[in-house]
Every structure is written in C-alpha cells, then in structure tokens.
C-alpha cells in the first residue's frame, strides 16, 4: 500500500486523521474489560495505511537510535514488520514460550484478564537471536492499558542485555496509568511512551 501523502506535520490534518482512525476501532466488552479492537483496521485498508503512516511519523525522529523492533503477540505483529522493512531494522516477537522455538529468556507478568494461570498470570518470551547485548529496541503493540504486558516486555529486553528506546501503541487508556508503570520498568530514563490515541478520542 502507498502512503496516504497527508501532511502529518500540520496539527489540524493530524487531528482529523486521528479522529477518522478512532471511528474505525470499535470498543467492545471482552473478558471483563472494555476492549479497543484494532482488528477493525484490517477491514479498512485506507485506515490501516493511515495507522502505518502515523506510526512512521511518530518514530522517524529517533529511528537512528533503534537497532531492533519488538512486537507483542498478536496485534503488535500487524505493525512492526512494516516499520522494520521501511527502516531496515530487525524485527523480533514477544510471545508465550510454547508458541515458538529457541526461547532464550522468559518472564512472568500479570495483565487485565486471566492468562495462563487462574490468578491472571502469563508468560512472555523472546528467541535466542532476538536481541544482542547493547541493542536499542522499539516495542510495538496495539494497546497500553494497565501496562503489565509492556512492563514485561521492557524487563525481558533488559534481561537480554538490551535497552528500550521507545514503546508505541495505537491506543492508550490513560486513566489506567500503564505509561507510568512502563517508564518505571525501564532502566533508561529517556525511554519514550507514544500512543496515537487515548480513550478520550472515542
């Protein structure tokens, strides 16, 4: 797909683009929480491309400080490969350990709804060749809520000897303060937390 050619440096153009994007993402109840379903973007190629363009616009200023891009299972997979191909950066997955071979590092975390354990716990892993010591990483996902998944991703990357330059999301539920949790998890005080939309945009 070709870029939308919108001038996203123009605040009004960007504002209108984000408003249109929000209309494409339904909010539905799922496992006891309000779920922002970015799957709606898949049915609208124009808005999907717009999401790519908005991501590119947001990360371009610091991509020279990124060595690899990590994407969370599963919706992070929709966006990270596009960025990886465009900026020529390695892309790696953060998934449950039983979902892929050659797992090197694993961490347990807790999220908004129940995962592997009855207490709501889950596990996140990366593969042996995902990152190298000293790598600077951009993490990509669809949603930042309580920040449990993001925190786990940051700690996992750091456990492997790398650092997180930034995390980017389509939607952030600001009232849950996942941003604060993510920032606290990072050992790099300059780590950026970026979101295209918040719950106030819906």
Task: Put a short name on every predicted segment.
Residues 67-68, 136-138, 166:
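Structural motif
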């Amino acid at each position: 797909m070709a870029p939308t050619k919108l001038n996203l440096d123009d605040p009004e153009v960007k504002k209108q683009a984000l408003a249109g994007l929000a209309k494409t993402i339904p909010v539905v109840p799922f496992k006891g929480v309000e779920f922002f379903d970015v799957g709606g973007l898949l049915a609208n190629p124009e808005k999907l491309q717009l999401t790519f363009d908005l991501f590119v616009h947001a990360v371009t200023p610091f991509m020279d400080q990124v060595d690899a891009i990590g994407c969370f299972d599963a919706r992070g997979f929709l966006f990270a490969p596009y960025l990886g191909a465009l900026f020529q950066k390695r892309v790696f997955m953060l998934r449950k350990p039983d979902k892929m071979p050659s797992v090197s590092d694993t961490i347990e975390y807790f999220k908004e709804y129940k995962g592997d354990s009855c207490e709501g716990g889950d596990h996140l892993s990366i593969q042996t060749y995902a990152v190298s010591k000293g790598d600077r990483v951009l993490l990509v996902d669809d949603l930042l809520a309580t920040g449990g998944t993001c925190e786990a991703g940051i700690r996992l990357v750091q456990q492997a000897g790398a650092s997180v330059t930034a995390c980017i999301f389509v939607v952030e539920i600001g009232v849950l303060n996942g941003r604060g949790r993510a920032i606290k998890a990072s050992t790099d005080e300059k780590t950026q937390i970026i979101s295209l939309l918040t719950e106030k945009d819906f």
